[in-house]
């Protein structure tokens, strides 16, 4: 599994600890130092079945500064993916990617269901 995080994020820290406590092996990736590429984001979006908005860090400063709440309603998926790929701080985190799933954010129950704990 691939675990994409911002190490200073308390939710990411909690999710990482949860993975470790539950014995899951994962590759760790820093979302700012190694920002997801547009192609990766598109692949994850398709695999997840989630709406594109779920990939945006809607509580982040950058999201608010760019006025994305209103912009997202009027731009294409391609434009939105380009925006996400431009800055890791715009991307919802953590992201957990497995062979057949993609999860954004950390909600313990959802992770338990996906990982069949």
Which residues fall in each region the model found?
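Local sequence-structure signature of Cys/Sec-based thiol-disulfide redox active-site neighborhoods
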Residues: 1-22, 26-29
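Thiol/selenol-based redox catalytic cores and closely related redox-interacting motifs
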Residues: 33-117
């Amino acid at each position: 599994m691939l675990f994409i995080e911002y190490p200073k994020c308390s939710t990411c820290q909690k999710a990482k600890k949860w993975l470790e406590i539950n014995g899951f092996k994962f590759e760790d990736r820093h979302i700012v130092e190694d920002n997801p590429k547009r192609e990766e984001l598109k692949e994850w979006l398709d695999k997840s079945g989630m709406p594109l908005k779920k990939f945006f860090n809607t509580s982040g400063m950058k999201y608010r500064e760019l006025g994305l709440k209103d912009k997202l309603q009027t731009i294409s998926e391609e434009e939105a993916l380009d925006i996400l790929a431009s800055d890791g701080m715009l991307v919802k985190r953590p992201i957990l990617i497995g062979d057949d799933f993609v999860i954004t954010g950390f909600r313990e129950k959802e992770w338990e269901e996906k990982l069949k704990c």
